[in-house]
Curated annotation (Swiss-Prot):
Domain of life, per lineage: Bacteria
Motif ('KMSKS' region): 618-622
Disulfide bonds: none
GO MF entries: aminoacyl-tRNA deacylase activity; ATP binding; leucine-tRNA ligase activity
Phylogenetic classification of the source organism: Bacteria, Pseudomonadati, Pseudomonadota, Gammaproteobacteria, Alteromonadales
Native species: Shewanella woodyi (strain ATCC 51908 / MS32)
Endoplasmic reticulum recorded as keyword: no
Name this polypeptide is given: Leucine--tRNA ligase
Listed Gene3D superfamilies: 2.20.28.290, 3.10.20.590, HUPs (3.40.50.620), Isoleucyl-tRNA Synthetase, Domain 1 (1.10.730.10)
Record-linked InterPro entries: aa-tRNA-synth_I_CS (IPR001412), aa-tRNA-synth_Ia (IPR002300), Leu-tRNA-ligase (IPR002302), Leu_tRNA-synth_edit (IPR025709), M/V/L/I-tRNA-synth_anticd-bd (IPR013155), Methionyl/Leucyl_tRNA_Synth (IPR015413), Rossmann-like_a/b/a_fold (IPR014729), tRNAsynth_Ia_anticodon-bd (IPR009080)
Entry keyword DNA damage: no
Cellular component terms (Gene Ontology): cytosol
Length: 859
């Protein structure tokens, strides 16, 4: 065995072995319990970052641990390879997205292999290949046949100069990223999938997700947003027209003093014909940012339409206002406004001098709305026959009256909206729909799938090549001329079913049901919490669609979810002569002064620029504070990087990158290697004879088996990998100091090291693989079982008892583990410190906590 730990040499050799023996390639085996471990697949951006490394290390640790439990473990990998960054890179280089994407895949694949992740590479998929998206297109046509797909107009970001649709990321301060033209909202036809048909099931089945983080489940419940309320009809005064509103607070309806409608509401557009002010307001609203964050932050504005609505219960007329906080594509496009009991309505009413009428008051106090709305539930007053009712009684009574008069009905609504899957981009899967000469829209026939995206294109940054190439859209259906859809799928489509394709990646069908139902659901899914409401919801939705089309049996795609925290690093900048911040890589920084807590006070870069230290922040290109995994692996080895990633923080918390801690991880592996080397150098060992061990040897063996039990529990149940590693480190401290003179000393060391390398195998697999062999084992470590704690070793022969007199420590005694209370008392009273502090006193009470404490009360 070589004396020095040489990670590059060891890791290359072990990785070659895994590749040659196809160690991690698996097939279905009904005689073995399966375990499907999956980390969210990467976008091939060019290089792995530390966030990737953390995600995939966690997944690999779980997968390797489960393998040593004797399970049939599937851990696949692939590439979420469609998307806007490839288009942007192609525009920048006047090239095509495909070569850029495939080059990045090749590079990142080598990086993943370099880190020693145990993937079944035979199942590798790339979502930009026709072999993959063909089945996505096929599935979409099946959903269309089931009535789950429809087309309607929806708003997009539009650049009038380039005459093109922009993604949200391409809108900078309201302008086009390329030509700086002001972006407007434009209505264009788009395809939608009816996720709302599954809203109830998506919500109720959250209760099945026992092993998902509560935070993710809460976020999904809120995103789906089920509410119970009443939809009621308001008649427009002096007109045959009417409109509906929906409210979850019908108890406040008697306090309605105005109605707010969306600028795009038909009533507003009609009224605008006679109001230039309203027409201008409608135009202004058309170009407004309607994201939730923008809506929450913007100034609430409105214009009176001149129209009035008739209150469905009182018959009173209330003004109708067009307001920028009401959206036409959300709810009914109209809301009843009760300023006394809604803060937004209150502020709007104050601003425009509208009436405020209180109708709800606290049970035990008078209503005070002099400074703000009263938004709590309470008791109705000023509400005619509903006076004195509480929320639920008022809800029921108002519902009954509106229903009886045909003016309203109880209704369940959802915040969730149908999924718009059309993207006016090029680098995505073509939507498999065609328009016939008579305008009829039909799915592409199955025998014409896949609709292949041409890859040999040049991006000009203005129009999608498949929109610009009029010939590409031309096709024939049953001999009749037709035009293909030139929109492509939202890339969330590809990531919504990739986990299932891994089960049968080469099947000439979307899924092989037998294989899919062997592997699914995923046993452990790992990814960032930022995906809680988009990917993870679509992922669940698609699984139910797959089930309802007969391809899978289960209701949910993943049993257990782990959401790992971000990786943070120090961030520094200086301000250049133009007043702009220039972010400097931590690798280019010299810290000149720190405070008493070790925080940076003064730092400069290699050019002498004085830097501002902004603290730890998420590694990002924008702050130039990313650390290249390749550099760290070259410097310390993959196992060191993996060990640091798992030890530095619990997996769901943020991890602060500190190279000094990476060095600490490296020192630990070198120490482990040295202990093993010194042990192996002493030659072969005899078998361990547990019965002949002395007290110190038994104590060391007890610590070993306690560690085995704790590490298994920390990894499997608690997923506290950092505390598992800490336990092994503590044990190694003991082993380093353990005697090795006798044959049984060395036999015990052999048992301990054989266990330690298996405990660490999921985390530092290259080192563990090598040490396992050096310890004289013929089998490869992947083919052995996780160590089991010897229960008999955990039984203590003796106990250390603390002896107190009047609550103060006076002695420590060692007694047999099965000693009686009387024997412990006798031994305790015989101690010199006890005699001294009880002499001449009367013993009033003796308290014995078995195996721990003897307290003598005397005065």
């Amino acid at each position: 065995m070589q004396e020095q730990y040489q990670p590059s040499e060891i890791e290359a050799k072990v990785q070659q072995h895994w590749q040659d023996t196809k160690t991690f390639e698996v097939t279905e085996d009904e005689n073995k319990e399966k375990f499907y471990c999956l980390s969210m697949f990467p976008y091939p951006s060019g290089r792995l970052h530390m966030g990737h490394v953390r995600n995939y290390t966690i997944g690999d640790v779980v997968a390797r641990y489960q393998r040593l439990q004797g399970k049939n473990v599937l851990q696949p990998i692939g590439w979420d390879s469609f998307g806007l960054p490839a288009e942007n890179a192609a525009i920048k280089n006047s090239s095509a997205p495909a070569p850029w994407t495939y080059e990045n895949i090749d590079y990142m694949k080598n990086q993943l292999k370099m880190l020693g992740f145990g993937y079944d590479w035979s199942r590798e998929i790339a979502t930009c290949t026709p072999e993959y998206y063909r089945w996505e297109q096929w599935f979409f046509t099946k959903l269309y046949e089931k009535g789950l797909v429809y087309k309607k107009t929806a708003s997009v970001n539009w650049c009038p100069n380039d005459e093109t649709v922009l993604a949200n990321e391409q809108v900078q301060d309201g302008c086009c990223w390329r030509c700086d033209t002001e972006v407007v909202q434009k209505e264009i036809p788009q395809w939608f999938i009816k996720i709302t048909d599954y809203a109830d099931e998506l919500l109720s089945d959250i209760d099945q997700l026992d092993e998902w983080p509560e935070q993710v489940k809460t976020m999904q419940r809120n995103w789906i947003g089920r509410s119970e309320g009443i939809e009621m009809t308001f008649q427009v005064a002096d007109s045959d027209e009417s409109f509906d509103i929906y409210t979850t607070r019908p108890d406040t309806v008697m306090g309605v003093t105005y109605v707010a409608i969306a600028a795009g509401h038909p009533l507003a557009e009609k009224a605008a014909a006679n109001s230039p002010e309203l027409a201008a307001f409608i135009e202004e609203c058309k170009n407004a940012d309607t994201t939730e964050a923008a809506m929450a932050a913007m100034e609430k504005k409105g214009v009176a339409t001149g129209l009035y609505a008739i209150h469905p219960l009182t018959g009173k007329q209330v003004p109708i206002w067009a307001a920028n906080f009401v959206l036409m594509n959300y709810g009914t496009g109209a809301v009843m406004s009760v300023p006394a009991h809604d803060q937004r309505d209150y502020e709007f009413a104050i601003k425009y001098g509208l009436a405020i009428e209180g109708v709800i008051k606290p049970e035990d106090a008078e209503l005070d709305i002099s400074e703000e709305a009263y938004t709590e539930k309470g008791v109705l007053f000023n509400s005619a026959e509903f006076d004195g009712l509480d929320f639920q009684a008022a809800f029921d009574a108002i519902d009954a009256k509106l229903t009886a008069e045909g003016k309203g009905k109880r209704q369940v609504n959802f915040r969730l909206r149908d999924w718009g899957v059309s993207r006016q981009r090029y680098w995505g899967a073509p939507i498999p729909m065609v328009t016939l000469a008579d305008g009829t829209v039909v799915p592409t026939p199955e025998d014409q799938l896949p609709v292949i995206l041409p890859e040999d294109v040049v991006m000009d940054g203005i129009q999608s090549p498949i929109k610009a190439d009029k010939e590409w859209a031309k096709t024939q259906i049953n001999g009749e001329d037709a035009l293909r859809e030139t929109d492509t799928f939202d890339t969330f489509m590809e990531s919504s079913w990739y986990y299932a394709r891994y089960c049968s990646p080469h099947a000439d069908e979307m899924l092989d049901p037998a294989k899919a139902n062997y592997w699914l659901p995923v046993d452990q899914y790992i990814g960032g919490i930022e995906h809680a409401c988009m990917h993870l919801l679509y992922f669940r939705f698609f699984h139910k669609l797959l089930r309802d089309i007969g391809l899978v049996n289960s209701d949910e795609p993943a049993k257990r979810l782990l959401t790992q925290g971000m990786v943070l690093a120090d961030a520094y900048y200086y301000t250049n002569e133009k007043g702009a911040r220039v972010w400097v890589s931590p690798a280019d920084v010299t810290v000149q002064e720190t405070d008493d807590k070790g925080r940076t006070v003064k730092a400069v870069d290699s050019h002498g620029n004085e830097l501002v230290y902004t603290g730890m922040s998420k590694m990002s290109k924008s702050k130039n504070n990313g650390i290249d995994p390749q550099e760290m692996v070259d410097k310390y080895g993959a196992d060191t990087v993996r060990l640091f990633m798992m030890f530095a923080a619990p997996p769901e918390l943020t991890l602060e990158w500190q190279e000094s801690s990476v060095e600490g991880a490296h020192r630990f592996i070198k120490r482990l290697w040295k202990v093993a080397h010194d042990h192996v150098a002493k030659g072969t060992t005899v078998s361990l004879d547990v019965k002949s061990l002395d007290a110190k040897q038994k104590e060391l063996r007890r610590e070993l088996h306690k560690t085995i039990a704790k590490v298994g529990d920390d990894i499997e149940r608690r997923q506290m990998f950092n505390t598992a590693i800490a336990s092994v480190m503590e044990l190694m401290n003991r082993l380093q100091k353990a005697p090795t003179e006798t044959e049984q000393d060395r036999a015990l060391m052999q048992e301990a090291l054989s266990a330690v390398v298996r405990l660490l195998y999921p985390i530092i697999p290259h080192t563990s693989f090598s040490l396992w062999k050096e310890l004289g084992n013929e089998e490869n470590i992947e083919d052995v079982r996780w160590p089991e704690a010897d229960e008999s070793a955990l039984v203590e022969d003796s106990k250390l008892i603390i002896v107190q007199v009047n609550g103060k420590l006076r002695a420590k005694i060692t007694v047999p583990a099965d000693a009686t209370k009387e024997a412990v008392e006798a031994q305790g009273f015989a101690e010199e410190g006890v005699i001294k502090h009880t002499e001449g006193k009367t013993v009033r009470k003796v308290i014995y906590v078995p195996g721990k404490l003897l307290n003598i009360v005397a005065n």
